[in-house]
């Protein structure tokens, strides 16, 4: 399952799906081993993007902006040489709604300062104090977007994004009610796109994967930093990085 978070900027864009897929996490759910893996894909990975018979080299996150979810999925499939069965895409407003609907989540701010993005994006004023904190949707959005203060930069941000997803999954599973699940999905339906059927029968089938979601392993696809002739910063991923 490919999870994509679409960066809609300040939220002032007329199209709530206009933007780059700045969050891309590949989720593999294995009911036999009862384990799930989450692998973050760096948005700046330099890769081939093929559309309408033409191939260009560009950043991985631009595939969505060029051709929507279909092209983003195809590009990642080509890069990793895998088949992606399903996708779930959520925009920034949807993340806020989702966290609020499950009653907030508990995260651990590892820094000795408040996490915020107000300096770069004044419209987002939420802050997260150091240590273990119960946060709402607005705070979860800031927590999963901040990168300039993080010594690990975008890798640190992706680590926090995986933490937020893991905490949402844990909170949803703790509800243990089909009606609760349906209510959560309905609350974010305008700000979520997916090719997973979400009717009652399908939700019951998805509950068969519940045990596999109790153990989640987290990974990060890392390449080598590079600045190319165009002045842009990229991640160069080789077969060595992919095999690792």
Residue spans of the language-model regions?
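Non-catalytic, solvent-exposed segments at the cell envelope interface
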Residues: 1-244
